[in-house]
Amino acid sequence: MRSRQLHNVSEDRETLSRRNKRSKTSLNGHIPIDLLIEIFLKLPVKSIATCRSVSKFWTYVLGRQDFTELFLTKSSSRPQLLFACANDNGYFFFSSNQPQNLDENSSPIAAYPLTHVPKSRDLGPPINGLVSLRGERILKGRIRPVDVSIIYNPSTGESLTLPKTNMTRKKIYTVTSFLGYDPIEKQYKVLSMNMSYEKHPKCEGYQVLTLGTGKLSWRMIKCCLNYQHPLKNSEICINGVLYYLAMVNGSSWPTRAVVCFDIRSEMFNFMEVYRELSYTTTLINYNNGKLGMLMGQEAHKTISGICRSFELWVLEDTVKHEWSKHVYLLPPLWKDAVANTRLYFAGMIGTSEIVLFRPDEPLCVFYYNIDRNTIKRVGIRGLEAFKYFRIFLNHVENVKLF
């Protein structure tokens, strides 16, 4: 009995010690910060966005970098599929759990509504749960809306409107913007390129904006390529390097190539690929760290039932530009499962599951397993009202607020 009492006293002292240690991190008599963080980590991301408006103290806690990183780490352990459905009113975002280990009788995917961003276009892939897009917004000091870049959080509906880029008024431009992230410096940057169309399309100005540094402003940078025409919806950011497809000067005429932009150094580089890139070339994050390229047969702009094979190229050495090439022959079932459906590569889950989709039919996606050489059609529920969509793999929820 005496021993049990001593044991209870010891436990009480340990509990009191933890509480005293925890209370040291509180401010002005509020609930201790680390206890609040533990509670907030259990809330859904939409609830966290609502909690920002409760008090200045909660806003402070939810804006701390340690909380943001903890939440992102937790979210990364359960990646999702992100659906972006477009119509005349902008983008409508949906999400669902990312299927793992698909079996023969795979159930339909249920897409749950997230948020809506009006009057928007040119959507880029999510970077740590944030996306870049363009839209017309009324900036401070202006009466009419102007075309600007926007950083948007599909999970919370929060957005950040960026200032208008600098450009020469005498010329007609369109602007292409890509979002990137440097995991070492933990910085988000936006690369913007002004496209001129006087004789033929080309970039005439490169600008960079760093997020989270106070005042938002664009800085002019130089590019080593004397001609390039970036292809929209082709970009991907891996380990602090932004890769995208572009038309660049070849030996005799422009050719498709992979352009690299280092987020930290803000330097461009040209990636040599000893093969002409086909219309179906899609950049992917292979095995969570390597640049990969999925390509169908050169004669086709999409993947359909008549295709017999496709290629997977993996960048093995970023300095020497050495690639490994893998050719996959599609199974006989491919022709019956896909038929005349025109598909696009969405990306790759892990090292074996390739996901394909048809943009104008948000009713299903296709999973091709390169190890088992099998193809599965999986239905989608919840997107029936839309006629166009895009799908992004390995999406994570983020509570970042700049």
UniProtKB/Swiss-Prot annotation:
Pfam families: F-box (PF00646), FBA_3 (PF08268). InterPro entries: F-box-assoc_dom_typ3, F-box-assoc_interact_dom, F-box-like_dom_sf, F-box_dom. Residues 26-73 form the F-box domain. It comes from the Eukaryota. Residues 1-23 are annotated as: Disordered. NCBIfam families: F_box_assoc_1. This is Putative F-box protein At3g23960.
